Amino acid sequence: MLHFKTIALLSSVTLIGCTSSPHAWQGQSGSKRVFIELETTPEGTSQAFLSLPEQWIDKAKADTLVLSDESILAIFNRENIRFEGSFHSGKDSIQAEVTTYGKTREFALGKVDSLQPIYFAQNPRPPYPYRSEEVTYVSCDSIQVAGTLTIPQGKGPFPAAIIISGTGKQDRDGTFSGHKPFFKIADYLTRQGFIVLRADDRGTGKTNGIYEEATTSDFARDAQAGINYLKQRPETDTKHIGVIGHSEGGQVALMLGADSPDVSFVISLAGVGVDGLQILKLQNDAILRTTPGMTPERVYQFMSLFNTLFDKVHSVPLEQPLDIPLRQAFDQWVAQQDEATLKAVNFNDGKDEMFFSRYLHQAQGRWYREMINYDPENYIPRIHKPVLALNGDKDIMVPAKENLESIKQLLDKGGNTQYKIVELPGLNHMFQRCKECTREEIPDLEDVFSKEALQIMGDWLRENVQKDRK
């Protein structure tokens, strides 16, 4: 805890040594930025304004401000925020503790002129030893896809790859909380001599369309449209075009590896290797087990409910409505539970009906129903080209053991001997070296994308793609 020489709390005081122009400092802790400004009014009183961009707080004015040559305390009543810090290096920096929503983070702030973008050291930065182009192409349903094409220096043609994103609307860089993993992959591979195409998802960035109305099959068609675009580029070696997919994008990559004659290699990054019903069960079980305060008994109780619902959705033919059979399965499960179990899964005070309504809405969607009926046996045994499958052993979204094992078994079933499967220790679903390895931790980790995973990809591509071109 930081301490102060003064104990009086005043709503406004004169800022020692400050002029009428504002002074500003900014710091970052994980994926959270803090930006504080101190300024003096014409009447000579001092004011503090705080911005927390990732928490949608912009220039909140301090209700209480205590300043000295050594320290600052600013309290923001409405937002229930406390900023407590000590000045260093002639007030060029502040070591601070910022408390929001009952949680305290430590920040090292430096003096700035204005709010700066969120920063992660592993994100690529210029100058880049390659050419970048903003490109557009048309997919099915007249979707206008926008993306970035990176082209190596030198004389082509070059082998090429398209990066395919996972579940959820993502921009071309795969941006989450300031991390840009797809940009990092593209930067690395382009430096290794590959053309790389990465694109905004439907309804994201500069790509039109409605993401929520699309299915995995639609995403596969969007990726094929990107491959078709690559084939038209004179810099592309059309005999060596590959797909690199993350999570659901890994599933799409495996589908295209089976169905598209244009694909010459496949890289699955935490890609789904089991059927849709199993991935739902594996994922929810893994997430629950890593949730703070979740006991094994409560995991069992939640999974009993979830598995009942998943099994029912999976059993209903796609052309038939879900509402009645799902309602019956849900009511039957509730009727069979004791009061302790219903309380454990938060089914009290009408919350059971709220839960059912939300789940029914999700389960009735085209994407969900196609996903839960996905069967990798329809695709992976038909892949007869080089495949690299990577997973982190701390992945709770696409658990590594079961998914990698299934990919291997299905490749073997089809007679494919050109594959490499690697389970990477200590990495989560986003290929970050994790600590607690929970979903909540992901945004705050410094890793953007594992250097080890990139090295494996680069080595494998040299051996299986670039060597083959010579």
Residue ranges of each PLM-predicted region?
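Short amphipathic alpha-helix adjacent to the substrate-entry channel of hydrolases
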Residues: 175-196
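Accessory cap/linker subdomain of secreted extracellular hydrolases
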Residues: 269-381
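N-terminal cap/lid segment of alpha/beta-hydrolase-fold proteins
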Residues: 30, 114-156
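Conserved alpha/beta-hydrolase "acid-adjacent" motif
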Residues: 396-402
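Central antiparallel beta-sheet cores of small beta-barrel/beta-sandwich binding domains
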Residues: 22-87, 93-100, 182
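Alpha/beta-hydrolase active-site loop
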Residues: 213-234
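Short beta-strand element of the alpha/beta-hydrolase
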Residues: 157-167
